[in-house]
Amino acid sequence: MNMKKLFLLNLPYLLFVYPFDKLAQAFRLAPGADLSGKLLSIGDGFTAARSSPWLSFHPTDLLIGIAGAVVLRMAVYLKGKNAKKYRHGIEYGSARWGTAADIAPYMDKDFFQNIPMTQTERITMASRPKQPKYARNKNILVIGGSGSGKTRFFCKPSLLQAHSSYVCTDPKGTLLPEIGTFLERKKYRIKCLNLINFRKSMRYNPLAYIRSEKDILKLVNALIMNTKGEGEKSSEDFWVKAERLYYSALIGYIWYEATEEEKNFITLLDLINASEAREDDETYQSPVDLLFSQLEEREPDHFAVKQYRKFKMAAGKTLKSILISCGARLAPFDIKELRDLMEYDELELDTLGDSKTALFVILSDTDSTFNFVAALMYSQLFNLLCDKADDFYGGRLPVHVRLILDEFANIGQIPNFDKLIATIRSREISASIILQSQSQLKTIYKDAADTIVGNCDSTLFLGGKEKSTLKEISELLGKETIDLYNQSENRGSQVSHGLSYQKLGKELMTQDELAVMDGGKCIFMLRGVRPFLSDKYDLTRHPNYRYTADADPKNVFDMERYMKKQRAVVKPTDTFDVYEINATT
């Protein structure tokens, strides 16, 4: 404790020096030779002491005045130290519902610079508010059972704000037609990866985003992680590690040696199909073996050569098994439409933070066969945006990128997502994880699920009945203190009545109350703020609602028409073959 604070704390007690000083002066001036005589004539002493309003500076009077003030200060200190600690009205808990005053510091005055959470609560997009204590990350956990309105009450209002770039999972393929016209009106670049109808999708080539050898390893890791069979063990065995070496070698060869037109998954599949190993002839060389032999002669320390050399350490029978495993893993790519989808790239993932862009990822909510493509894309997207922010923009993207991950459990596993969600905030990237129940997250990310939830400062519960989710929400809401009134009656030879009052702790909302919560209500929790029980956001009251297909069917967005129009526009980076024709007359 500093001296200034100590002085201010004891200053009031200096005022008591005066009465104790005057008391000592009155006793000293009272007539009488002994104690009894002075006490009998103490009135005369007070009269003499009051004759002068000033403090008596007689050493005895001054000493007694100071001593009296010190004794009083010590008495107050000892009483406070030994006092019982009461928390009146909050003995069993202080939980309560939040008010407008609680959320006010976290909202921006400009409505469109917020993320709508409920009808009355929203959070600002400003990552660095004037008062740092009000800073919260924009990672949001949205939980709602089937039919609770996750798309209508959260996704659509977020997109209609149009303050960021958006990457939005669209499980049913309905969000883009309903919101696309509005985004086009706002001059957004619109991208679409459609894994239900490939013909309505823009092209996506994962190899187009490889910038270094570490990107090759990241791509291979994401590919293997999201193409596991349902019965496959989570820990890698020998075969998976061998596959990893082979994929790394082939992709490394393509990236370094192939032409720009050949840097795609089609070339990778062609190389795998051209690979062969014979059990009875260890010296046999397939066309792929010959390619790597030629490369090794030129560059013995080539990245691809090192990976391939390790792969070829296996015997012929083992190599054949590995190649079969590779073919089985990439079997979905035998579909021509999927191969065409990944022939070249139109998504331009690394530019999402440069200007306002909306990327819709349309997934099937009934079949997860091609969901690994989305997981590959998201894995690359996080790394690309973080690298772009660090290398070109001093650590922060000029346009905030919001990932609205509807049906997050259907996307697949994004490698190191628990680490990414903890670091993307500073790069102006945020993720909204939308689930039907919290157990879905634990199924995919196991122990890392708690880390992911812990890095979401906001939680929006739209309703549900899954038991573990209800238990967790109820515990987070906390307990309030309530008054209990008991009335008793005893009947015997005489009738007696009794009354008793006591306090108890009760959950702000119990699990059964959460399970039967009004369908129009939701619970919003923000770190460091009391929870809010509010109405779900009314989409029809949004200022931009009139531009959606919900308001007017004429606003339905046609992605095929949009893609044709975009492909007809010549870009500065497009290359052409120029032929000179000499016309003779």
What positions do the PLM features span?
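Basic- and hydrophobic-enriched, low-structure N-terminal and domain-boundary segments
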Residues: M1-S148, R152-C155, K479, N490-R491, ...
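P-loop NTPase motor domains
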Residues: P19-D21, Q25, R136-I429, I444, ...
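A short glycine-/small-residue-rich loop at the edge of a beta-strand within enzyme catalytic domains
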Residues: P105-Y106, F372, F408, G464
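Low-complexity, polar-biased intrinsically disordered regions enriched in Pro/Ser/Thr/Gly
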Residues: I123-M125, P129, K228-F238, E260, ...
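Conserved ATP-driven motor cores of ASCE-family P-loop NTPases powering translocation/secretion/packaging/pilus
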Residues: I421-I523
